[in-house]
Curated annotation (Swiss-Prot):
Protein name, per record: GTP-binding protein ypt3
Localization per Swiss-Prot or TrEMBL: Cell membrane; Endosome membrane; Golgi apparatus membrane; Cytoplasm
Main location: membrane
GO biological process, one term: vacuole fusion, non-autophagic
Keyword Protein biosynthesis in annotation: no
Function: Has a role in retrograde traffricking of proteins from the endosome to the Golgi. Involved in the secretory pathway where it has a role in acid phosphatase secretion.
Short motif Effector region, span: 39-47
Record keywords: Cell membrane, Cytoplasm, Endosome, Golgi apparatus, GTP-binding, Lipoprotein, Membrane, Nucleotide-binding, Nucleus, Phosphoprotein, Prenylation, Protein transport, Transport
Protein family membership: Belongs to the small GTPase superfamily. Rab family.
Covalent lipidation (S-geranylgeranyl cysteine), chain numbering: C213, C214
Residues engaged in binding GTP: 17-24, 65-69, 123-126
Length: 214
């Protein structure tokens, strides 16, 4: 096996939200440090990967991006299967994209594992002069629904690294706690397998009390 294909954990993380909110550019910025101002709407599903190291463990982050249009909803179940993290993205300049966050969250919780780590992401902060959704409104929604929250710009890279790292670190923390409680040295899934996490409610309560993003 090639060295770049070796890893201790594979974390599947999904990007969801309305079409045009910048999901594909967030994916490109995090995995390749690129931005395409003429990016077109995703057709179907695509994903990219990036390897990171947390606590001396090699993590392969597999980030999935899907079309936000209704006609692609048939792929929903397969898209969410095995996901341990999710970023719900809206456009801070487009109120309707934020208004639809509740629907995306409902769909996520219907199809994904109940213990998935979720972050609400307000994208396009490079367009602050066009802001339609206040930070306070989004923070309130996130707090009410037990989500972490951050605002980003895929164009100038603001907070993109922090957003993904926060989600991946929280997944890793939960996995590490599960391993410690089981009394073993850590879980090492075979390459190519997605690791499912199942934190207790105590884990989730600790998360809310100990971490607030932005």
């Amino acid at each position: 096996m090639c060295q770049e294909d070796e890893y201790d954990y594979l974390f599947k993380t999904v990007l969801i939200g309305d079409s045009g909110v910048g999901k594909s550019n967030l994916l490109m910025r995090f995995t390749r440090n690129e931005f395409n101002i003429e990016s077109k709407s995703t057709i179907g599903v695509e994903f990219a990967t990036r390897n990171i190291v947390l606590d001396n463990k090699k993590i392969k982050a597999q980030i999935w991006d899907t079309a936000g249009q209704e006609r692609y909803r048939a792929i929903t179940s397969a898209y969410y299967r095995g996901a341990v993290g999710a970023l719900i993205v809206y456009d801070i300049t487009k109120q309707s994209s934020f208004d639809n966050v509740g629907r995306w969250l409902k769909e996520l919780r219907e199809h994904a594992d109940s213990n998935i780590v979720i972050m609400l992401v307000g994208n396009k902060t490079d367009l602050l002069h066009l802001r339609a959704v206040s930070t306070e409104e989004a923070q309130a929604f996130a707090a009410e629904n037990n989500l972490s929250f951050i605002e980003t710009s895929a164009m100038d890279a603001s907070n993109v690294e922090e957003a993904f790292q926060t989600v991946l670190t929280e997944i890793f923390r939960i996995v590490s706690n599960r391993s410690l409680e089981a009394g073993d040295d850590g879980v090492h899934p075979t390459a190519g397998q997605t690791l499912n996490i199942a934190p207790t409610m105590n884990d989730l309560n600790k998360k809310k009390s100990s971490s607030q993003c932005c």
